[in-house]
Each structure stands twice: as structure tokens, then as C-alpha cells.
Curated annotation (Swiss-Prot):
Its main location: membrane. Belongs to the ATPase alpha/beta chains family. It comes from Phocaeicola vulgatus (strain ATCC 8482 / DSM 1447 / JCM 5826 / CCUG 4940 / NBRC 14291 / NCTC 11154). This is ATP synthase subunit beta. InterPro entries: AAA+_ATPase, ATP-synt_VA_C, ATP_synth_F1_bsu, ATPase_a/bsu_AS, ATPase_alpha/beta_chains, ATPase_F1/V1/A1_a/bsu_N, ATPase_F1/V1/A1_a/bsu_N_sf, ATPase_F1/V1/A1_a/bsu_nucl-bd. F-type ATPases have 2 components, CF(1) - the catalytic core - and CF(0) - the membrane proton channel. CF(1) has five subunits: alpha(3), beta(3), gamma(1), delta(1), epsilon(1). CF(0) has three main subunits: a(1), b(2) and c(9-12). The alpha and beta chains form an alternating ring which encloses part of the gamma chain. CF(1) is attached to CF(0) by a central stalk formed by the gamma and epsilon chains, while a peripheral stalk is formed by the delta and b chains.
Length: 511
């Protein structure tokens, strides 16, 4: 059976109906399948890709556009591709920036679609999955100690607007590239173009993406000269970026997470003969809420009845189809870190609540902690991890983590008494608990490499051994003599002791 050429019959915003003439007469002619890509040539020569979402009757399909529909007219020719949207694969995509349909948007040479992977794929079969439990240490104290990340797991970064989700993601990419020599795929889903631009520049400056020394030098001088890019160096990069910004139509924003995931799968599932490829991939999604939001827009445009709070009725299904593909197989692993915007800081909203069910670890960023000036603003009592288990992380790590949580919880309970009666009314034991809890709270902060240009403090990565040692010393009262300020924005306990001694010296000189 053969494919047929269609024509646009209706355009309503990003929704395009395509009529296939003669389909009702000649039964040998097939309508394009659901999720197939169709192409429309605009008057200026550019190609628009649309994706089939519904069959209407026997001769019309309803599609959603992956780019602006400005300039489309009824009667324009539509060519079926016979397959879903595909993403390019191989070393050629290392260090590159792509859009939802796999086109390079970084101004460099075009990418080959040979051997391309379709973005709509089945998840790995049950017998292909790996069940090995392994901790992925990030060099960030609060994460490694209290909510350790699992290699091949799914991690959610929850927080409202402006609490530091994107900065934490950028630091994780930076640390994992340096510490584990890991390969990252970053999917920018419906976020700001400025943030995408900042991330690309940050990655070039830190060496995660390599454009060559000549280009880097010209960039430092304030020029963006792509003629100086060394393509041999680009293929040594440790990241690939896939962007669908917030100015894109909802079709692109709802599919961009799948496009990024397909790139991550292509590296994980490389053939055994291909030894160049990374097998353990880090997949970052910023922001998974925008994936849900775009799905809601598409659902409304297609005329589906909304469910709770106006979200699409297929919310759980769409989320499940994507999350089931993010997993470890016997070939390699995909560890995903997903930033989750929480509307109005309400964790019971259907979008974050649906995401929660799929996660192995949650890192909750809190506005109350940003108000204390503690960054990363991770809430140690709200954040959780499935693998904080003595059989996986070891007994000492588990015991210290539990003691930290207990002292912070007790401090939280005492805050009401302190706010009404003051510290003087507490027993000696409770006063000691509060003082140590305040030191623990400050020691959970850490300077980030990606924030160095704002803070002027060089970023640090702290090993899990140093982290456990530091918190144990605070809990055991070995550093009670140091001022609280000594523990803020330092890496190891040795740095805190050194800073504390300087503060004590400065205070004694003032007297």
C-alpha cells in the first residue's frame, strides 16, 4: 500500500488539519499513522514538521505543529514521511545543540539522519532491565549525605520560582562531567531562552562542551565566531543539548522531553562493537512541569475534556510512557534529574504529584531556606531517597544522616518556643541541640563552581568521606567553640575550622 500527498484544510493556531483527497475512494491508499511526521514546505522554502495526533473520518488527520504556523494557507501540499520524528545519533551529536525535530540550531554544520532513532519508542523489555543498586556521588554535601542519588534512578528537584533549580542542575552537570567523566544530555523543556544561552556558554567555559581553544579565546574576547570551531574537539564534548524554549508552540514543548530522552537512549543502547560511546548517561530535564503544561495545551487544542485543575485527562499516561523509558538496562544506564516547578509552592497540584510517583529520590528546594541565605536551598527534612539504606550506603553514612535529620527536626519543633519565650527559656540540652542544629544547617551550604561569577567564592566538590566526617564532628560537639558563621559556604570541616579561627582572631582584635 502506498502513501498519498495531502493538503491543508484548516489551521487553528498550532493545530493543522490535513485532507487526503481520494482516500475514501481508493482503499489501497493509507492515511499516515498516529505520531507520524508530515512535512509542509512554506512559501519561503523552510520546512515545517507537523505530527499526526488524530484521524478524523476516513480522509482527514489532525496534526500539531512543531514550529510556528504563521504563513500557512489552505490548500498547501503536505508530504507524509512514513515515520515518526527522528533524532540523529552517534558522535556527531556530541557537543551540539538541537531542536525538537533533530535539526542543529547552533549555527554549525548540519547533522546526518543516518540510523536516526524515532522519538516514540517502546520502553525496554522486563528481561533487559538491570537491578544493580549503586550510589552516584555528586560532590554536593546535602545531596550525598541525606538524599543520595541512585545510578540509573530518577531524581526530582522540586521548588517554586527562583529557588535555584537550574543552578543546581548546572552544578550537577559540571560535577559529574569532572568527577565521573560522565556524559550528559540536557533537555530544556519550555524554559527561558536566556537560561539556555547561559548554559551553553557555561558548558563551553567549563570544558564540558569543547569548541576548541581558538573559539574559546574569541569567546573570552566577546566574539562568537563559529568559523573557529574545531569539529574534532566538538566530538570530545561530554554533553548534548536539546532545546524547546517557552516561545515554541505547545507541540514542540510537549515532544522535546521525548527528543532529549531519545538522544540519551541512543548513547545507552549503542552496539557492542562501538566502544567510543558513553554507556552511563545523565539525562537532565528542565522543566518537567512544562512538559505537563504543554500536554495540557495540546489536549485542549484537540478538544479533549480537561480533568482536575484543567490538566489533560491523559496526564498520568503521558508521564508514565516517558518515565518508563528512563531506566537502566544491561547495556548501560540513564540517570535522570528532573527539575519540577511547583505551582504556587503547592506539592498537591496534579502535575508535581503525578511526577512524585515515578521518582527514586526527591530534592525539595525551599523558599524558607533561601531566606536564611543558605544555598543550595535544599530542605533536608522534606527531601527523600529510596537508597538511604545501611545495606547500600553503609552503616556509618546511614547513622550520621539519621542523626542530622533528628537534630534538625528537634530544632524545628523548638522554634515555636524560641519565637515566643526566647533561647533563655530552653533547657541546657535543648540549647545545645539548637546551637548544633544551626551549625549543621549552615554546613549543608556549599559554594558552587557555576555560581562563582556571582559569589566570588570558588566552587568545591566534597567527597562523601569528608562529608560524613564533618557532620559527625559537629554532632559530637567537637567544633562547638567555633562561631556559626564559620560553617556557612565552606566545603570540608577543615575549611570551616580555618574560617572559624580567623573569625575568632578578628573578634579578639576588635576587643
Amino acid at each position: 500500500m502506498s502513501q498519498i500527498i495531502g493538503h491543508i484544510s484548516q489551521v487553528i493556531g498550532p493545530v493543522v488539519d490535513v485532507y487526503f483527497e481520494g482516500k475514501g475512494i481508493d482503499t489501497d491508499l493509507l492515511l499516515p499513522s498516529i505520531h507520524d511526521a508530515l512535512t509542509i514546505k512554506r512559501n519561503d522554502g523552510r520546512i515545517l514538521v507537523v505530527e499526526v495526533q488524530q484521524h478524523i473520518g476516513e480522509d482527514t488527520v489532525r496534526t500539531v505543529a512543531m514550529d510556528s504556523t504563521d504563513g500557512l494557507q489552505r490548500g498547501m501540499e503536505v508530504i507524509p514521511t512514513g515515520h515518526p520524528i527522528t533524532m540523529p545519533v552517534g558522535n556527531q551529536i556530541k557537543g551540539r545543540l538541537m531542536n525538537v525535530v533533530g535539526e542543529a540550531v547552533d549555527g554549525m554544520r548540519p547533522l546526518s539522519k543516518e540510523g536516526a532513532f524515532p522519538i516514540h519508542r517502546e520502553p525496554p523489555k522486563f528481561d533487559e532491565l538491570s537491578t544493580v543498586q549503586e550510589v552516584l556521588f555528586t560532590g554536593i554535601k546535602v545531596i550525598d549525605l541525606l538524599e543520595p542519588y541512585s545510578k540509573g534512578g530518577k531524581i526530582g528537584l522540586f521548588g517554586g520560582a527562583g529557588v535555584g533549580k537550574t543552578v543546581l542542575i548546572m552544578e550537577l552537570i559540571n560535577n559529574i562531567a569532572k568527577k565521573h567523566n560522565g556524559f550528559s544530555v540536557f533537555a530544556g523543556v519550555g524554559e527561558r531562552t536566556r537560561e539556555g544561552n547561559d548554559l551553553l556558554r557555561e558548558m563551553i567555559e567549563s570544558g564540558v562542551i569543547r569548541y576548541g581553544e581558538e573559539f574559546k579565546k574569541s569567546m573570552e574576547e566577546g566574539h562568537w565566531d563559529l568559523s573557529k570551531v574545531d569539529y574534532n574537539e566538538v566530538e570530545k564534548s561530554q554533553a548534548t543539548l536539546v532545546y524547546g524554549q517557552m516561545n515554541e508552540p505547545p507541540g514542540a514543548r510537549s515532544s522535546i522531553a521525548l527528543s532529549g530522552l531519545t538522544v540519551a537512549e541512543s548513547f545507552r543502547d549503542r552496539k557492542n562493537g562501538d566502544s567510543n560511546g558513553p554507556r552511563d548517561i545523565l539525562f537532565f530535564i528542565d522543566n518537567i512541569f512544562r512538559f505537563t503544561q504543554a500536554g495540557s495545551e495540546v489536549s485542549a487544542l484537540l478538544g479533549r475534556m480537561p480533568s482536575a485543575v484543567g490538566y489533560q485527562p491523559t496526564l498520568a499516561t503521558e508521564m508514565g510512557q516517558m518515565q518508563e523509558r528512563i531506566t537502566s538496562t544491561k547495556n548501560g544506564s540513564i540517570t535522570s534529574v528532573q527539575a519540577v516547578y511547583v505551582p504556587a509552592d503547592d506539592l498537591t497540584d496534579p502535575a508535581p504529584a503525578t511526577t512524585f510517583t515515578h521518582l527514586d529520590a526527591t530534592t525539595v528546594l525551599s523558599r524558607k531556606i533561601t531566606e536564611l541565605g543558605i544555598y543550595p536551598a535544599v530542605d533536608p527534612l522534606e527531601s527523600t531517597s529510596r537508597i538511604l539504606d545501611p545495606l547500600i550506603v553503609g552503616q556509618e553514612h546511614y547513622d550520621v544522616a539519621q542523626r542530622v535529620k533528628q537534630i534538625l527536626q528537634r530544632n524545628k519543633e523548638l522554634q515555636d518556643i524560641i519565637s515566643i519565650l526566647g533561647m533563655d527559656e530552653l533547657s541546657d540540652e535543648d540549647r545545645q541541640t539548637v546551637n548544633r542544629a544551626r551549625r549543621v544547617q549552615r554546613f549543608l551550604s556549599q559554594p558552587f563552581a557555576v555560581a562563582e561569577q556571582f559569589t566570588g567564592v570558588p566552587g568545591v566538590m566534597v567527597s562523601i568521606e569528608d562529608t560524613i566526617k564533618g557532620f559527625k564532628m559537629i554532632l559530637d560537639g567537637e567544633v562547638d567553640y567555633l562561631p556559626e558563621q564559620a560553617f556557612l559556604n565552606v566545603g570540608t570541616i577543615e575549611e570551616a575550622i580555618e574560617k572559624g579561627k580567623k573569625l575568632l582572631d578578628a573578634a579578639s582584635h576588635k576587643k
